């Protein structure tokens, strides 16, 4: 992920025709696919409420958190919506090994003009912010506290991100989108099912514009299974 993506939405799609939802809405989409666009699962069945919440994120630049039990397909739901819009989508699993450095970047040794130098290499977060990319944080409620505070800085739509290591202020790309999935809704594990999840700072939870619960398979999906 070195080069920025010089693309922007250039077509409109019908929500009814694309997702099978009874709605007259039209959404922006990209006419061409690139390497960051997920593959389309033609047999995927969309849950109406979850789909409309995700589409609100894409259409109106809202931060959307999808909560639900394991195995319900929360992340896949976001990916399949993105796939039909040809919207580049990148998933990051916030397990306990993902650190602040992984997201922001770090100093690395490189060769320039035949000489070995040390320079700062931006991480996945600065790159995503500067591009028309849908960034999805999986297992959002399992993230480390230092990582969560980094994420909090980009939860505001159109908010700037400061790279202190480079004395650089990054403005969000007009088509950067942010999503997350979680098993809990920020209150920690009250059931004993999800050991390792954390209570999330309420100030951060309030920055999510939309939280939708996706906890069960729809009836048509159950029939297929």
Model segments located where?
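Single conserved hydrophobic/aromatic residue that forms the stacking wall/gate
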Residues: 216-225
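AAA+ P-loop NTPase catalytic core and its hallmark functional loops
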Residues: 2-217
